[in-house]
Amino acid sequence: MERNVILAKNAGFCFGVKRAVDEAIKYQKEFGKKIYTLGPLIHNNDVVNYLEDNDIFAIELSDADSLKKGDVVLIRSHGVKESVIKDLTDKGLIVKNATCPYVTNIQLKVKKCYEQGYKIIIVGDENHPEVIGINGWCNDSAIITNGKTELENIPAKVCVVSQTTEKKETWNKVLNEIVRASKEIVAFNTICSATDVRQKSVQELSKEADLVF
């Protein structure tokens, strides 16, 4: 039986991931030694192997204790908690930040609103590195929801942001819940435009394919 494989029109690296890979290669050439990234820069074995061939290795945060003063650590596109950057710097490590600019924007908005007394609500996956990192910019105090269950005891003064890869439908659903319950709301739709384009591309592909991965 003949099968045709169709590649989605907008498949490939997103801007943030490509930028992080480019930054890693740039810093390896600049420092001329191993570069350590906090977690894999990308979930693609071919690219991971290419990076390792160029002295760029993924480690877990717990492995940072075994690094030496002057070693170079790269923050990947997902970003990390503010405290992680401080801890790594305090260890004498050279920290280079390749957090996606869109994620950095969320982190700074969360930090500012938290300092202004807003309760932070993040729409996204509580176990995703990006969300874990964002939560760290408000002292790990955010309410995190994936929209599958209704929020309870929503505070009167809230700041709402989204994981960059969240579905627009989920964002709208959660925001509608919050609007009904809160009196003062600052909402930033921080879904990456590339995510929206890719989701629409997959929807179009599903109309002509029997199976979508």
List the model feature ranges, each with a label.
Residues M1-V212:
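The feature marks the mature, well-folded catalytic cores of soluble enzymes
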